[in-house]
C-alpha cells in the first residue's frame, strides 16, 4: 500500500509541477545546496521509513509471554533488552498506531522531494526502488532476525515518537483496545502440551526434550483433570486384613508376599475399611503367638471422595500424615466439577486435618491400640461444612457415610504423574485395572528362592522350644501350604 501511495503521489505532484511551470522546464541544478538539501531529506525519509517498518514488524512480533520468559531465563544481555522493551510493547495498539503513522508520513513525503530533484519518470522509479529495498525488504529482514536487539537500541526513539504522536495515537489505540481487546498472553493447557511435544526429540524438529521429560510434563498438566477414582486400586483388587484375623504364619506369609508397606484393615466386610496397618510395626509380633490384628497399632486411614482431584490428594500426602487413603463414593455431586478446578490452592494453615487425635481406645496399661469397629473409623481431608481446597462441597459426614470403592496411595498419584506404571519386586500386575501381568513366574520364583523366605519356613518348621525342650513339628503339607501362600498371585495396592 505504501508503494502505491508513493507512486500515486509522485505522479500527482509531477503533474502539478509541470502545470505550474515550477519544475517542468528544468530541474534543480545538480550539486547545488538546494539539491543536496533535498537529496539529504529524501535519504533521511527512506531511512526513517525503513526503521519504522522494521520496528513495526520486530516489536509487534514480540509477545508479552516471550518477553517475560527472556527476562527470567535469558542471557544477561537478553534480560536487559527484554526489560527495556516490555513497557513499550504493553501498549500494543498505541505503539502500532504510532509506528504506522510515522511510516506513512515518511512514505508520503518522499515523492515530494524526489520530484524536485528528477523528472516524473525518474522520481517514480527511484521512489519505488528506495521504498521497496531500503524501506521495506531490508529493514524487515533484519528486524525479523534481530528484533529484540534492534528494538532495544531504538526504544528511546519509539518513546519520543509515542510522546509526539500521543494526541492521535492514544485515542485510536484506546478505541482499538475496546473494540478488539487485548491478546491472550498466556497459553492454555492444550497449547502448552503441544508446545512441549514440538520441542521433544521425537518430533524431529531439533528439540532437546527427551521422551521421559515430555511425558512427565504432559502428565503434570493432565493431573489437574484426573480424579481419585481414575488412579485408585479397586477395593476388589486390594489386599487387606480383617481386624479379627490372626497374625499367624499364613497371614505373615501373605503380607511378605505382597511386599506392601501399608495394609488396609477392615471389619467384617472388605468395604468397611476402618484403618491401616504399618507392616514395619509387625517386626515385634511373633507369628507363633497368633496375635490378633486388633491387638496391634492400627492407624487411621483418611477418606477422600472419588471426584477429588489428584493434586489435592498429593498435597495432603505431602503433609506426611498418611500416604494411603480410602476412596469413597459420595452420594450427590460437588458443586464445582473437577475439570474446572484449575486454580492453585493457597492454604492459610500449615497444619493438616489428618493430624487430629485418633479416636482410639486403650485397654489397661497396654501399648497396643484397638480401633473402635462399630463404624468405619476414617477421617476425611475436610472438616464439617468446609469446602475442599478446590471448592468441593462434600461434608465430612457425607464422606464418612460413603461406600469405599478403592484405595489410593502416593505411588498411584506418582504413576499418573509419570504416566507409567511403577513396578517393584513383588508386583504381579503392571496395571491392576487392565490386568496386565508382569513375569509372574519369575517374581514367584525369586520370592521362593529368597533367603528370608527359607529362614521363615525354617523357623516355622522348627517352631519354638518349650520349657521341657520339646520342639513343635510342622507337617510337610503345612510347609507346602506356606510356600504356596508366599508365591500366590500378587495384587498390589501401593
UniProtKB/Swiss-Prot annotation:
Q: Which residues lie on this side of the membrane: Extracellular?
A: 1-43, 115-121, 181-494
Q: Where is the CNNM transmembrane domain?
A: 31-213
> What InterPro entries does the database record attribute to this sequence?
ACDP (IPR045095), CBS_dom_sf (IPR046342), CNNM (IPR002550), Ion_transp-like_CBS (IPR044751)
Please verify whether the record's keywords include Transmembrane.
yes
Q: Which residues does the annotation flag as glycosylated?
A: 350, 385
**Record keywords: Metal-binding included?**
no
Q: Which cellular compartments is it found in?
A: Membrane
Q: Where are the transmembrane segments?
A: 44-64, 94-114, 122-142, 160-180
Single biological process term from Gene Ontology: magnesium ion homeostasis
Topology in the lipid bilayer is annotated as: Multi-pass membrane protein
Alphabetical GO CC annotations of the entry are: membrane
SUPFAM superfamilies, per database record: CBS-domain pair
Q: Where is this region: Disordered?
A: 459-494
- Cytoplasmic domain ranges by topology: 65-93, 143-159
Q: Could you tell me which residue ranges the CBS domain spans?
A: 232-292, 297-352, 364-425
Task: Kindly state which keywords UniProt assigns to this record, in alphabetical order.
Answer: CBS domain, Glycoprotein, Membrane, Repeat, Transmembrane, Transmembrane helix
Q: What is this protein called?
A: DUF21 domain-containing protein At4g14240
User: Species name for this entry?
Assistant: Arabidopsis thaliana
Q: Which gene encodes it?
A: CBSDUF1
Amino acid at each position: 500500500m505504501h508503494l502505491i501511495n508513493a507512486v500515486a503521489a509522485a505522479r500527482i505532484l509531477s503533474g502539478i509541477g509541470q502545470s505550474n511551470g515550477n519544475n517542468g522546464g528544468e530541474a534543480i541544478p545538480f550539486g547545488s545546496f538546494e539539491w543536496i538539501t533535498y537529496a539529504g531529506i529524501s535519504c533521511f525519509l527512506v531511512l526513517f521509513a525503513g526503521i519504522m517498518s522494521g520496528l513495526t514488524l520486530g516489536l509487534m512480533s514480540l509477545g508479552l509471554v516471550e518477553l517475560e520468559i527472556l527476562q527470567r531465563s535469558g542471557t544477561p544481555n537478553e534480560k536487559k533488552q527484554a526489560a527495556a522493551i516490555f513497557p513499550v510493547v504493553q501498549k500494543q495498539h498505541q505503539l502500532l498506531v504510532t509506528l504506522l503513522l510515522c511510516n506513512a508520513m515518511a512514505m508520503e513525503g518522499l515523492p515530494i522531494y524526489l520530484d524536485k530533484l528528477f523528472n516524473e519518470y525518474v522520481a517514480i522509479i527511484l521512489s519505488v526502488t528506495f521504498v521497496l529495498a531500503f524501506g521495506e525488504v531490508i529493514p524487515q529482514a533484519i528486524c525479523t532476525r534481530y528484533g529484540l536487539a534492534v528494538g532495544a537500541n531504538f526504544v528511546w526513539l519509539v518513546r519520543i515518537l509515542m510522546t509526539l504522536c500521543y494526541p492521535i495515537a492514544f485515542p485510536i489505540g484506546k478505541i482499538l483496545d475496546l473494540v478488539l481487546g487485548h491478546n491472550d498472553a498466556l497459553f492454555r493447557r492444550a497449547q502448552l502440551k503441544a508446545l512441549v511435544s514440538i520441542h521433544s526429540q521425537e518430533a524431529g524438529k531439533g528439540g532437546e526434550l527427551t521422551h521421559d521429560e515430555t511425558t512427565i510434563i504432559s502428565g503434570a498438566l493432565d493431573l489437574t483433570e484426573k480424579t481419585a477414582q481414575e488412579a485408585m486400586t479397586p477395593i476388589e483388587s486390594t489386599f487387606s486384613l480383617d481386624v479379627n484375623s490372626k497374625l499367624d504364619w499364613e497371614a505373615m506369609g501373605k503380607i511378605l508376599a505382597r511386599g506392601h508397606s501399608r495394609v488396609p484393615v477392615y471389619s467384617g466386610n472388605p468395604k468397611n475399611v476402618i484403618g491401616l496397618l504399618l507392616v514395619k510395626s509387625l517386626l515385634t509380633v511373633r507369628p507363633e503367638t497368633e496375635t490378633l490384628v486388633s491387638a496391634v497399632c492400627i492407624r487411621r486411614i483418611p477418606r477422600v471422595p472419588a471426584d477429588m482431584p489428584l493434586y489435592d490428594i498429593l498435597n495432603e500426602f505431602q503433609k506426611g500424615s498418611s500416604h494411603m487413603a480410602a476412596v469413597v463414593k459420595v452420594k450427590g455431586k460437588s458443586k464445582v466439577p473437577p475439570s474446572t478446578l484449575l486454580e492453585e490452592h493457597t492454604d492459610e494453615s500449615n497444619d493438616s486435618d489428618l493430624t487430629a487425635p485418633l479416636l482410639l481406645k486403650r485397654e489397661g496399661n497396654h501399648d497396643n491400640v484397638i480401633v473402635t469397629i462399630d463404624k468405619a473409623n476414617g477421617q476425611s481431608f475436610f472438616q464439617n461444612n468446609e469446602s475442599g481446597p478446590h471448592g468441593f462441597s462434600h461434608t465430612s459426614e457425607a464422606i464418612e457415610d460413603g461406600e469405599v470403592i478403592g484405595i489410593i496411595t502416593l505411588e498411584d498419584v506418582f504413576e499418573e504423574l509419570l504416566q507409567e506404571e511403577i513396578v517393584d519386586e513383588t508386583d504381579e500386575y503392571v496395571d491392576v485395572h487392565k490386568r496386565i501381568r508382569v513375569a509372574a513366574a519369575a517374581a514367584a520364583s525369586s520370592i521362593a528362592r529368597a533367603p528370608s523366605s527359607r529362614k521363615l519356613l525354617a523357623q516355622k518348621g522348627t517352631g519354638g522350644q518349650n520349657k521341657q525342650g520339646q520342639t513343635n513339628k510342622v507337617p510337610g503339607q503345612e510347609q507346602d501350604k506356606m510356600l504356596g501362600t508366599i508365591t500366590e498371585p500378587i495384587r498390589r495396592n501401593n
